[in-house]
A protein has these predicted regions:
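A short, acidic, amphipathic alpha-helical segment used as a generic capping/interface helix at domain edges
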Residues: 72-76
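Short S/T/G/P-rich N-terminal loop/turn motif that feeds into the first structured element of a domain
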Residues: 1-52, 59-70, 80-122
Length: 122
């Protein structure tokens, strides 16, 4: 059974990198809107606290892997201007997806929340 996967990524923007971060995020989102498999991507910013939060909703784990495959240059461009403070996964990631996220899930920065109940309506 394939289940939706939702990511919530809290990022601390590097001092002096607000504008480059904003531009890298805009370019990344424009790219995935045209080419990516995500159902939804939304990024929010708190300029005073120099933090951003990104939500990404995928149909399944295969779409997560596809996103990583085609979007790596954009992911790297955004990552040059921030660090991940917290990464939450909502759903049941495959072993391959969990392995790809392991750097964010260790050290108390991340967690996986298993589904209990719900639905999606678009």
């Amino acid at each position: 059974m394939t289940e939706q996967i939702l990511f919530r990524n809290v990022m601390k923007i590097t001092e002096g990198s607000l504008e480059p971060f904003r531009e890298a995020v805009r370019q990344a989102i424009e790219f995935v809107e045209r080419n990516g498999p995500q159902i939804m991507v939304r990024t929010f910013i708190d300029e005073q606290e120099m933090r951003a939060v990104s939500f990404q909703l995928y149909r399944n784990c295969e779409d997560v892997l596809r996103h990583w495959e085609i979007s790596d240059p954009h992911i790297r461009a955004v990552s040059k201007h921030c660090s991940v403070e917290k990464f939450e996964v909502y759903g049941n990631p495959s072993d391959e997806v969990a392995a790809g996220l392991s750097q964010f899930l260790s050290g108390g920065r991340g967690q996986i929340m298993n589904p209990l109940a719900g639905f999606t309506r678009f």
